Amino acid sequence: MEPYALTIHEARQLLDKKEISSVELTRSVFDRIERVEPKVGAYITLARESALSAAAAADTRLQSGGIAPLTGIPLAVKDLICTTGLRTTCASRMLETFMPPYDATVIEKLKTQGAVITGKVNMDEFAMGSSTEHSALGSTKNPWNLACIPGGSSGGSAASVAADMCLGSLGSDTGGSIRQPASHCGVVGIKPTYGRVSRYGLVAFASSLDQIGVLAKDVTDSALLLSAISGHDPSDSTSVPREVPDYAASCEKGLSGLTIGVCREYINAEGLDPEVADTVNRSIEHMKAQGAACVEVSLPHAQYAVAAYYVIAPAEASSNLARYDGVKYGFRDPEADSLLEMYARTRSRGFGKEVQRRIIIGTYCLSSGYYDAYYRKASQVRSLIADDFKKAFETCDVIVSPVAPTPAFELGAKTEDPLTMYLSDIFTLSANLAGVPGMSVPGGFSSTGLPIGVQLIAGHFNEPALVRCAWNLEQAVNIANKKPAL
């Protein structure tokens, strides 16, 4: 096996035994990037020189015995997480040359462990999209079928992991942006509980929904990554001071004593692809065969999640993105003759169509006379959705559902139909609105060879139950070693 194809835990064993060095591992990853990146287009910025320097430092650390789980491991980072010395573009013309003056807390945590950052990966502009086609710096393709989308907005994160162009990646999830691309690219993705991972240094889209998470080749790797980036951060007022468990310790526990909930509103949803439904139902049977109990649960207000989300998220985005006006940093239109013209031209030329659309929607929802009719009502629906989850978790530990209604669709199929694109996240939005953790784990493949993920959702801070359930499902399905033919 080539070093770039290793999982994190496999690489960890070889590094600890001195059977491979971090420099050798990192060079292997960059050789792989050189071969397949022109096909996939996962990266915005490569950091070969600094990565090899970090790998050499990791090797020195390995010799001295100061080893952490991620020491010497090459990882990619979604390009809306701030990195000192490495531009952070948000896949937007507005920030195309922006160099952050500080590292995000999660980046500090990775560097403290001695991880190697390979570069910044592509995304939908400012994380607004479900296909990674809304990037000002080029679209990313699905490694399993280069004519298809990888999902979004963390499409570069998922594609880089699936294509073995890193051993793991950081992403962010505002309405499904980790779980949906993880499903489409056949990798594991975790959106943690809101407040579990610091958002300091994450460029904001919708602050009450955004959450940094991880994408990995298998469940064990995802657990290792999540443990590494979790924990309280005084720099983030929404960060929760709660002890971080060893998530990987949940991997080899059986499912006896665990209860899974089947939400019929999701399983019987209109527009659900039959192959996706079959994959979810088979996964439920796998978990029952391994000792899990199964009950039906109801999320009666889930049908309103899309409507509520597309009021709340654009409203918060319109506020967060007001800071990009061409004055302090970022793109500035050089042809404006007045301050007001500079604002208008900068924002109309610096933001793409989808970002402009959501800013306009959000501004309208917050405008005088419409706040109560839209934003307040959406916030009330959000509370009802959170209550639905609370009631469901009184009878089960983990809810099993689809991640997306269909496998990955073709590039360009939905770019001119925003409403159809928005419905791609119909099964993932509710977890963000409720602030609960969600996870996508590979469950099988479509008849055309495209990956299909299964979503697992747990109560607040019950990520160990997600990992436990996902690991057992992974063992039963036994497709973690299947790779795209690039």
Swiss-Prot record:
UniProt-recorded Gene Ontology molecular function terms: ATP binding; glutaminyl-tRNA synthase (glutamine-hydrolyzing) activity
InterPro entries hit by this protein: Amidase, Amidase_CS, Amidase_dom, AS_sf, GatA
GO biological process: translation
Substrates-to-products reaction catalysed: L-glutamyl-tRNA(Gln) + L-glutamine + ATP + H2O = L-glutaminyl-tRNA(Gln) + L-glutamate + ADP + phosphate + H(+)
EC number: 6.3.5.7
Active-site residues annotated for this sequence: 78, 153, 177
Any matching Pfam family: Amidase
Enzyme class: ligase
UniProt keyword list: ATP-binding, Ligase, Nucleotide-binding, Protein biosynthesis
One GO cellular component term: glutamyl-tRNA(Gln) amidotransferase complex
Family: Belongs to the amidase family. GatA subfamily.
Function: Allows the formation of correctly charged Gln-tRNA(Gln) through the transamidation of misacylated Glu-tRNA(Gln) in organisms which lack glutaminyl-tRNA synthetase. The reaction takes place in the presence of glutamine and ATP through an activated gamma-phospho-Glu-tRNA(Gln).
Quaternary organization: Heterotrimer of A, B and C subunits.
Classification via PANTHER family: GLUTAMYL-TRNA(GLN) AMIDOTRANSFERASE SUBUNIT A (PTHR11895:SF151), TRANSAMIDASE (PTHR11895)
Protein name: Glutamyl-tRNA(Gln) amidotransferase subunit A
Organism: Desulfosudis oleivorans (strain DSM 6200 / JCM 39069 / Hxd3) (Desulfococcus oleovorans)
Name of the gene this protein is made from: gatA
